[in-house]
Design a protein with these regions (language model features):
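Active-site helix-to-loop segments that bind/position phosphate- or nucleotide-bearing substrates
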Residues: 2-238
Length: 238
């Protein structure tokens, strides 16, 4: 029933617009919250400029009805958010050249790319567990070439789970820049010798309850959020 209802909802432009707006809004709120937390922890008041800009973009988003324009606002906010990393990572020994996917142009991007690959798996498992079709989404293109719903719902978890985790391991010096090597084909990647350490740190983090996630562990939070999406935004929408 979930799959049939999912197809009906995703074919309805009005519902698709509502889901896209709500998802991007939550992503922008997550970006602001993480920057505010880091600003407080590391005493970096200059981050307030970035959080204020993202807040302004969020206000524009709430007046928008066109999904393509919403994606554009999401992109502007993402650039602002990642520009803040140069402030956060100053004097840490980690260089930041701006967000780059594949190939990763610096070592922090290598950590982000690796972390998001783990998040993709977590999100896909949560979606399959709710009997939704991971290929049918509302924000990313439904062209059959990738699991659109996985990438749509991942947007809810990047900042509060993966970015937070990566900032933690950098601050605690649990992984050093020396553990990341340059590869001709893929840019910067994690050295094989550190992957076991990464997995240990990641699994420990994913199972630990966090106050910022309503007292749930990150893994539990993902599953709960996707389950609620299936029930509230698909089965009972409209």
């Amino acid at each position: 029933y979930q799959c049939k209802r999912q197809i009906e909802v995703m074919d309805e432009k009005n519902y698709q617009t509502i889901l896209a707006q709500n998802t991007i809004k939550e992503k922008l709120l997550n970006q602001r919250q993480l920057l505010k937390n880091i600003s407080k922890q590391k005493k970096l008041p200059s981050l307030n400029t970035y959080t204020h800009t993202i807040k302004t973009i969020t206000k524009s988003l709430m007046h928008e009805k066109n999904v393509d324009t919403m994606r554009g606002l999401e992109g502007i906010a993402a650039k602002e958010y990642f520009d803040a990393f140069k402030v956060i990572l100053a004097n840490t020994g980690w260089n930041w050249l701006g967000r780059s996917r594949r190939p990763a142009k610096d070592k922090v991007n290598a950590l982000l790319n690796y972390g998001y690959a783990f998040l993709e798996r977590e999100t896909r498992l949560a979606i399959v567990a709710t009997n939704l079709d991971p290929r049918i989404g509302f924000l990313h293109c439904n062209n059959g070439k990738k699991d659109s719903l996985v990438f749509d719902l991942m947007e809810l978890f990047r900042q509060p789970i993966i970015d937070r985790f990566i900032m933690n391991i950098i601050n605690r010096k649990q992984i050093s820049p020396d553990h990341i090597k340059k590869n001709k084909q893929y840019g910067y990647i994690l050295d094989e010798t550190i992957k076991a350490t990464w997995i240990h740190l990641y699994e420990s983090y994913m199972e630990k309850p966090l106050q910022s996630l309503e007292g749930m562990s990150p893994r539990e939070y993902i599953r709960n959020k996707v389950k609620n999406f299936s029930y509230n935004d698909i089965v009972n929408i409209g």
